[in-house]
Amino acid sequence: MLALLAFPTAGSRAAADPAACAPVRLSNVGWTDAEAVTAVAATLFEALGYAPRTPMLALTMTYVAMRDRRVDAFLSNWEPSGSTPIAPFLADGSVERLATNLSGAHYTLAVPDYVWQAGLRDYRDIAAWGSRLGYMIFGLEAGNDGNALVLDMIRANQFQLQRFRLVESSEQGMLSQVDRTIQSHRPIVFLAWEPHPMNLRFALRYLTGGDKVFGPDGGATVNTVIRRGYRTDCPNAARLLARIRFTIPDENIMMLAIQRDHMPPPQVARRWLRGHPDAWHAWLDGVTTRDGAPSLPAIRAFLAPGG
C-alpha cells in the first residue's frame, strides 16, 4: 500500500482551501467501479462545500488532462495493468500516486466455468482453443490498459497467440457478448476483474499463467492519483483523497446497484454513505469543510433526508 504523503499542517480553521480549489475535478473513465468510487468522492466533496466535477474521459486523456491541470484527481489507476499508460506522466512529475484505495483486486483473462472444466485453464491453453474461440479475445474500449497488454501478447506471439485478434468494445458491450456466448454455451476468453458484479452474474474462472502479463495471480491494487502540485494548492481536498479506502464488498454492492438496478451513481453513492458511516468516518481525520469548519457535522447534514 502506498504510504500517505505529507501534507501541510495547520489548525482546523487554517486548513480551509482557497476559493480556487472549490471545483474539484475528478476524472471518470466510465468503468462501473470508477463511476461508483468517483461518485462517492464527489458526494463527500459536495457535502464539504466544494463544487465537484466528474468529466468523462478516456484513460490516456485523463493523464493528459492532469498534466495540463484540467483534472485534479483520478481514483481508478489499476496496477500493474495500468503501469504503461501512466508511466510517462509519473516520470515527468505531472502526476503522482497519492494512496492505494483498493487492495486485493484481480484483473486478467477469464473464461466461463464450463470452458475451464473442458480444459482451458491457463494462458498456455488459449492457442489450442483458437478455432473454437474464432481466434478472438474480447476486451474493453480502445486505449484501455488491459487491452494494451493483450495486444502486446498478440504482437509478440506470447503463448502462441499471433493468430488472435482483440475485439474492443465498451464494458457493457463486452459483457453483453459474454452473456450471449454463455447463453449458447460456446467458449469465450475475455478481460475480467474483481470487484465487479460479473463475478456474481456469471460462473467464471480466471486463467492462470499470466503472471508476467497481468501480475502475480492477476492480483491488482487501485490507486488514487493527483496532478502535480495539488497537495500544496488544495491540501484539505488532497487530504480527503489520500484517506479514501474501499473494500471489494463495498464496491460490489455499489456496482450491482448501478448495473442491475440502473441507479444513477450519485444516488448509489449517497445510499452507500448513509448505510456505511463506519467506513468513511476515518477518512475525515484532519479534514474540514472547504471553509475550515468541522467535516463530520457537514456530511451528516448533507446525507440526512432532505439534505
Where do the language-model regions lie?
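Short helix-initiation/N-cap motifs at beta->coil->alpha
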Residues: W31-T32, Y50-A65, R165-Q177
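Short, well-ordered beta-strand elements
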Residues: P18-D33, Y50-P55, G134-F138, L241
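Pocket-flanking alpha-helical
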Residues: T38, L57-G93, Q177, P197-A203
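A bilobed periplasmic-binding-protein/Venus flytrap-type ligand-binding module shared by bacterial periplasmic
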Residues: H106-Q117, A220-D233, A257
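C-terminal functional modules
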Residues: R245-G307
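Ligand-binding pocket segment of bilobal, Venus flytrap-like solute-binding proteins
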Residues: V71-L75, D145-K212
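Ligand-binding cleft/hinge of the Venus flytrap
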Residues: A41-L48, G130-F164, R274
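A conserved helix-loop-strand patch within extracytoplasmic ligand-binding domains
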Residues: G93-G146
